[in-house]
Amino acid sequence: MKRIAILGTGMAGFGAAHAAHTAGVRPVMYDMHDHIGGHTSSYEFPGGWTFDEGPHVSFTDNDRVKDLLAANVAGQYVEARPKATNYWKGHWIKHPAQINLHGLPAELVTKILLEFVDVARRTETPAVRNYEDWLRASFGNTFAETFPMEYTVKYHTTTAANLNTDWIGPRLYRPKLEEVFAGALHPKSDDVHYISGFRYPNHGGFAAYLQPFRKIADIKLGHQVVRIDHKERVLHFKNGSSAPYDGVVSSIPLPELVPMIDGAPRDVLDAAARLACSEVVIVSLGIDRADLIDAHWTYFYDRDIFFTRVSTPHLQSPNNVPPGCGSLQVECYYSSKYRPLDRRPEDCIEPVIADLKRCGVLRETDRVLFRHAMHIPYANVIFDLETAPAAALVHGFLNDVGIGYCGRYGDWAYIWTDQSFVSGENALHKLLAGS
């Protein structure tokens, strides 16, 4: 198989390219944008500000991928333990909240503790039909309703009752009863996070990890696929060009990919249209001081707070900002299926700044030296109750017509950057095995 086409130049696309290179094949990669990176793109702005397309760090336990990425930045990376915190009704709560209840209203803490005891004493496992059931069964009603169910509406743009549980993995910590009580009675608790440590490039943002991969493929930017003739094996692009292929691997989001394919049947088109994904407006701010939030990520639960999550790029690498400055990257979530975007990205900037001041993150005396808003049409897969059967039908069709798929939006999975890279490798191996 000589002519391998890879659609997309993010982590998954370069995973596929790396596997092709290892197999002795030089692939051709196509991307609709004028830069590489996909959802892991980085942007360097005048004045010394660097922002990624969302808060990306490398925390893989896969030593092979870890070594590969480290080599790509010549060992020049920051290594740190993650810090996360939560904001709820004026309270700053160490993450995860379930073992850091100290200082919250006594009546609330009492109810949560009693229900955690009930959960621990339970002898029968309750039926779990959806994510809400799982939360109530795991943490009791009060904690579930106060924290994760509220965050779900802000982050996933729909209710926990409308989500399945396929995506949870290690994301929500299920503590021992002793941990819950200790965190309620004492102001200090053990650091608990599903990420034990992360790496981030010294310079160039997260996308610096990808730059050396450019030499292993022929990369054609500004090539947006609009049609795939899988019978003749030809890709057609918006710019009027076309390209034949012997095999193709795509990281294009499934709802975008399926309508491009000649002869896609109605049931598959309908299934692809049912797949839900959040979109996000990211507001990036540069501030004239660095002591903003002592955390890499902060989760905001209150629905009247405009945004959902805030990260601090200057704590990932000090080279992301000019000397003496700090930066905030603020995520505001929408989805076409559940919460349609109702404003221009730039219209989010002032509400974000206002609520950062209301929460105490920004002071009235702070100078905002840089401000920028971008709309990202695909953010996180929403695992609603239609997802599993719809994704299975779409993947079956792609297998039938010989189009490989990979990454978060090809596998339609809640996977991280290293998992996306491996997904691309696996898709390429599958393609070669079937040739």
What are these regions, as identified by a protein language model?
Residues 2-29:
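N-terminal Rossmann-like FAD-binding beta1-loop-alpha1 element of flavoenzymes
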Residues 12, 35, 255:
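Conserved Rossmann-like nucleotide-cofactor binding loop
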Residues 21-45:
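Glycine-rich FAD pyrophosphate-binding loop
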Residues 23, 224-329, 333-342, 346-347, ...:
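Mid-domain catalytic core of redox enzymes
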Residues 42, 96-97, 312-435:
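Conserved flavin/dinucleotide-binding core of flavoenzymes
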Residues 47-123:
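Dinucleotide-binding Rossmann-like beta1-alpha1 core, especially the glycine-rich loop
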Residues 78, 218-222, 369-372, 404:
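General small-molecule cofactor/ligand-binding pocket signal
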Residues 108-233, 241-247, 251:
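Active-site/ligand-binding neighborhood in enzyme catalytic cores
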